[in-house]
């Protein structure tokens, strides 16, 4: 059975595979970040969002994996076999957990659409031959500045330059709408 944990979020394992393994912070850093930013929502009995649920599951999964690794470390007598198991867990399972944690923390922090646009942008950048691409890779934290403009225009007709003669202009300055985030529980 081929299960893609990102499918319901509009991404895929393949899309995340464009990011190099050293791109993702350590599991410890990601766990600390999720606790610092989302502890209340993660510990709440309330359902907040699918990203909170997936993040909870990834954290629980990592805890179980560490319990198993500790058991193996304490019960496997052959040092070579023990090292093989530890290396496999750190290399393969560790990377998968780091990807999952990063994806869901990023979606909660920046918004799912921004993260998906970043993954596509990075994928295009990394596959473009070096002589033809900009020297620096896209940066996730700078994407909202450029994507907000595109989002605002979707589904709307172009704004008129002159006010309609039937409507009077308000004397109060226009308030800028704050962008709602998926991360609010």
Curated annotation (Swiss-Prot):
PTM entry text: Phosphorylated by host SRPK1, SRPK2, and maybe protein kinase C or GAPDH. Phosphorylation is critical for pregenomic RNA packaging. Protein kinase C phosphorylation is stimulated by HBx protein and may play a role in transport of the viral genome to the nucleus at the late step during the viral replication cycle.
Span of the annotated motif Bipartite nuclear localization signal: 160-177
Compartments where located: Virion; Host cytoplasm
Repeat region (Sequence), residues: 157-163, 164-171, 172-179
Annotated GO CC locations: host cell; host cell cytoplasm; T=4 icosahedral viral capsid
Region called RNA binding, residue ranges: 179-185
Keyword flag Metal-binding: no
Keywords recorded for this protein, A-Z: Capsid protein, Cytoplasmic inwards viral transport, DNA-binding, Host cytoplasm, Host-virus interaction, Microtubular inwards viral transport, Phosphoprotein, Repeat, RNA-binding, T=4 icosahedral capsid protein, Viral penetration into host nucleus, Virion, Virus entry into host cell
Keyword flag Phosphoprotein: yes
Region (3 X 8 AA repeats of S-P-R-R-R-[PR]-S-Q): 157-179
GO molecular function: DNA binding; RNA binding; structural molecule activity
Pfam family, one: Hepatitis_core
Region (Disordered) residue spans: 135-185
Described purpose of this protein according to its UniProt entry: Self assembles to form an icosahedral capsid. Most capsids appear to be large particles with an icosahedral symmetry of T=4 and consist of 240 copies of capsid protein, though a fraction forms smaller T=3 particles consisting of 180 capsid proteins. Entering capsids are transported along microtubules to the nucleus. Phosphorylation of the capsid is thought to induce exposure of nuclear localization signal in the C-terminal portion of the capsid protein that allows binding to the nuclear pore complex via the importin (karyopherin-) alpha and beta.
Family: Belongs to the orthohepadnavirus core antigen family.
Protein's name according to its UniProt entry: Capsid protein
Gene: C
């Amino acid at each position: 059975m081929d299960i893609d944990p990102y499918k319901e979020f509009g991404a895929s394992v393949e899309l995340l595979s464009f990011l190099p393994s050293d791109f993702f912070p350590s599991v410890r850093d990601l766990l600390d970040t999720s606790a610092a930013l989302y502890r209340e929502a993660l510990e709440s009995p309330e359902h907040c969002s699918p990203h909170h649920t997936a993040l909870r599951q990834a954290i629980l999964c990592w805890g179980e994996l560490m319990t198993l690794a500790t058991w193996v470390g304490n019960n496997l007598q052959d040092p070579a076999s023990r090292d093989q198991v530890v290396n496999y867990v750190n290399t393969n399972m560790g990377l998968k957990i780091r990807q999952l944690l990063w994806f869901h923390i990023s979606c909660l922090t920046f918004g799912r659409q921004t993260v998906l646009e970043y993954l596509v942008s990075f994928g295009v950048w990394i596959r473009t031959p070096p002589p033809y691409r900009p020297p620096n890779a896209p940066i996730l934290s700078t994407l909202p500045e450029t994507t907000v403009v595109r989002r605002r225009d979707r589904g709307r007709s172009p704004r008129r330059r002159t006010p309609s003669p039937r409507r009077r202009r308000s004397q109060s300055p226009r308030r800028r709408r704050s962008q709602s985030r998926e991360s609010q529980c």
